[in-house]
Amino acid sequence: MAKKDNIFKAGNFNDLPFSFNEEVTEVFEDMIDRSVPGYKSRLKLIENLGKNYYQNNSSCYDLGCSLGASTLNLLKAVGKKEGQIYAVDNSKAMISSCNSKFKNLTDSKKLDFINQDLEVIEIKDASVVVINYVLQFIESSKREKLLEKVFCGMKKNGLLILSEKTHFDNKYRNQTLFNLHHNFKSKNGYTKMEISRKRDALEGVLITDLEKDHRQRLSKIGFREIRKVMSNLNFFTLIAQK
């Protein structure tokens, strides 16, 4: 059972910017499940899409894999087919936890967890690439370059699965969805103080884009068949093909 997220309760908060350190790693499963609407449904979606788009003897990448939830669903999608899955994260704590948690799977050589910045990882022969709630933590000026590298390293007809938090250019809609997301977290047991403190910690760390900006960026790079396949409040999932 996942350890409960109490990081932002009174007495626990250190007033530092949010980071994926050991403290966050310990409670991340609980944190994301209670904070991101539709999270578990997206994981199942990754498995289903992976089954449809994985090409035999190719590679899958989970970029910004955190604790490997998406990775595990990619592994289910590939099944007994030949290929390799690379799960990459720049958090040493996250990768250390993954290597421990999935030791029986990494020993098979089919799955490889890599502690490296996404800016320097090499992408090659990829038929499925997952980027789940990751671009929002990367400097805005570097997002297009990362996606260009992904595109260049993908096989023809390869699939990108991109999930992000977003905001809206309509102020009323933006505030409405903000309030609904606040209510979602409240119903999942977070106090107003915890929600406020986490929001402050994420200030300047998590920077969202408009959905249309994501679409335009993908189209500019050369992706086609760009479609929204899931939307929950201010979180969405796009798929795009090379």
PLM features: residue spans?
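Class I SAM-dependent methyltransferase Rossmann-like catalytic core
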Residues: 13-17, 24-43
